[in-house]
């Protein structure tokens, strides 16, 4: 694996997706060292001059007015990390932990946090050695930063807590020792710089974005397959229709459908002069609905890319002016709203897919055997698979409720408005899994429907999608144990087998 040279503030979505998907060695751009060192010098000057500055020689939250003696500053930072590591729930997997750590490294290395280069390099060493801290998935409200998750991340630097090394959970000190690493001691402000920030919220939402992007592409292919299976018209994808409306997402979505449908299709030729005037909305309005979803994905991508490269701790060190300034960049409201928009898109992608599945079940609408199987009555075919899709799509409607409008005061009302961004992002994973299940059923159903079209072939790309599935799941001549087929189709979707048929979505 080639190392990623981290230029602070310049990470791309492609790089972040790679970090999420697989271990990625990091090298910090040497040009970042000067800004980091200057911010540390500013903090050290404040301590030496005995000036009062929040987070450097004061307490935190409601205790910000409490002045801390110089000889207690190291203990202050250690106590902060220990006390704030109060999360609950299942631990995050290695991929999520790695993404979160890289986001934190990227932010700290911008040089506005007053944290030593050696501490940043210690975090990089953990990533490179694949020593991952035990971080519970719950416990942050997304302001003042993701305190609990980032505290659990930071415990490992101190040799506290637990960590995973080579797939095994170990006491942190043991994991560090096995990896040839040593615990460190934090200096003034460094604990707060590590804990304060939106990196957990952003990592959660980024995973949702990456999964939504793949689901969108897969849904375009599945929708096109269904269009072919039920002898749907291609006229709704005509570029002129979408050009006169002018919605960019819709225009681009229609182009994606045209890309996979093309003009070379025996199925399309077979009903070119039929009497059917218009298709149901779940077919005809695919560009409009999916285009709106694409617009939401692109907006969320823009917000999350900015946040991935942001400095979001507090206070911030402006070394050129020799000032430490308190603000609120830790508030993850932009991330929460982006995650809420992603939730709407993921829910709608699944909801539209489920309606297409239902259409295929109805012999009057699809012109196919009931429930896509011969000898109906003896065979039930896709009857209950469609029910499963309906259950998943409906569940997502409840999960898509916005989190960004929720707030609950914390820290004795000092932190009286919060974003709930972590929960907003985390629920996207379950929603993505649900929509993947719906699309798996549609893929199975649409390919079965095309199989039943008397040997006619679809477009070249859709035939690839059909062949990919048929190499793993055979045609349904009679009823059989259905769940393993859905599971297999979901695995293929998760592996990006349909995504590869389209140009990049974002």
Curated annotation (Swiss-Prot):
The modification 2,3-didehydroalanine (Ser) is found at residue 144. GO terms for cellular component: cytoplasm. It is an enzyme of class 4 (lyase). InterPro entries: Aromatic_Lyase, Fumarase/histidase_N, HutH, L-Aspartase-like, Phe/His_NH3-lyase_AS. Its EC number is 4.3.1.3. It holds the Pfam family Lyase_aromatic. Contains an active site 4-methylidene-imidazol-5-one (MIO), which is formed autocatalytically by cyclization and dehydration of residues Ala-Ser-Gly. Coiled coil: none annotated. The keyword Cytoplasm applies. Disulfide bonds: none annotated. Pathway: Amino-acid degradation; L-histidine degradation into L-glutamate; N-formimidoyl-L-glutamate from L-histidine: step 1/3. GO terms for molecular function: histidine ammonia-lyase activity. The keyword Cytoplasm applies. It catalyses: L-histidine = trans-urocanate + NH4(+). There is a cross-link at residues 143-145 (5-imidazolinone (Ala-Gly)). Keywords: Cytoplasm, Histidine metabolism, Lyase. Its main location: cytoplasm. It is found in: Cytoplasm. GO terms for biological process: L-histidine catabolic process to glutamate and formamide; L-histidine catabolic process to glutamate and formate. PANTHER family: HISTIDINE AMMONIA-LYASE. Belongs to the PAL/histidase family. This is Histidine ammonia-lyase. It comes from Enterobacter sp. (strain 638).
């Amino acid at each position: 694996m080639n190392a990623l040279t981290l230029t602070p503030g310049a990470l791309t979505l492609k790089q972040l997706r790679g970090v999420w998907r697989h271990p990625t060695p990091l090298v910090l751009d040497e040009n970042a060292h000067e800004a980091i060192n200057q911010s540390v010098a500013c903090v050290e000057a404040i301590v030496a001059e005995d000036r009062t500055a929040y987070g450097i020689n004061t307490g935190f939250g409601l205790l910000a007015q409490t002045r801390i003696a110089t000889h207690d500053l190291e203990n202050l930072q250690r106590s902060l990390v220990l006390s704030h590591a109060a999360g609950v729930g299942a631990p995050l997997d290695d991929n999520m932990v790695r993404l979160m750590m890289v986001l934190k490294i990227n932010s700290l290395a911008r040089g506005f946090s007053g944290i030593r280069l050696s501490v940043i390099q210690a975090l990089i060493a953990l990533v490179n050695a694949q020593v991952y801290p035990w971080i519970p998935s719950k416990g942050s409200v997304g302001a003042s930063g993701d305190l609990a998750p980032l505290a659990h991340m930071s415990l490992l630097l101190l040799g506290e807590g637990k960590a995973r090394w080579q797939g095994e959970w170990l006491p942190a000190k043991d994991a560090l020792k096995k990896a040839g690493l040593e615990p460190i001691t934090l200096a003034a402000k460094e604990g707060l710089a590590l804990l304060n920030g939106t990196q957990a919220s952003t990592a959660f939402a980024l995973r949702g974005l990456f999964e939504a992007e793949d689901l969108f592409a897969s849904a375009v292919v599945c929708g096109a397959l269904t269009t072919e299976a039920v002898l749907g018209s291609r006229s709704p994808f005509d570029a002129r229709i979408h050009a006169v409306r002018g919605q960019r997402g819709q225009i681009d979505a229609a182009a994606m459908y045209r890309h996979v449908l093309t003009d070379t299709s025996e199925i399309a030729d077979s009903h070119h002069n039929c009497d059917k005037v218009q298709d149901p909305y779940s077919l005809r309005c695919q560009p409009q609905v999916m285009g709106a979803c694409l617009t939401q994905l692109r907006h969320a991508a823009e917000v999350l890319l900015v946040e991935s490269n942001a400095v979001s701790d507090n206070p911030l060190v402006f070394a050129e002016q020799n000032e430490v300034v308190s603000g609120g960049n830790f508030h993850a409201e932009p991330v929460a709203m982006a995650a809420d928009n992603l939730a709407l898109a993921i829910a709608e992608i699944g909801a539209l897919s489920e309606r297409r599945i239902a259409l295929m079940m109805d012999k009057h609408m699809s012109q196919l055997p009931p429930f896509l199987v011969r000898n109906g009555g003896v065979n039930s075919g896709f009857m209950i698979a469609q029910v499963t899709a309906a259950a998943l799509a409906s569940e997502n409607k409840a999960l898509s409720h916005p989190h960004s409008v929720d707030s609950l005061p914390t820290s004795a009302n000092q932190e009286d408005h919060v974003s709930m961004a972590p929960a907003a992002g985390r629920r996207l994973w379950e929603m993505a899994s649900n929509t993947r299940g719906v699309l798996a059923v549609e893929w199975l159903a649409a390919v079965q429907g095309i199989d039943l079209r008397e040997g006619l072939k679809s477009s070249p790309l859709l035939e690839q999608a059909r062949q990919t599935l048929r190499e793993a799941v055979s045609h349904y001549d009679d009823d059989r144990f259905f769940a393993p087929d859905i599971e297999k189709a979901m695995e293929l979707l998760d592996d990006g087998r349909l995504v590869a048929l389209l140009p990049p979505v974002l």
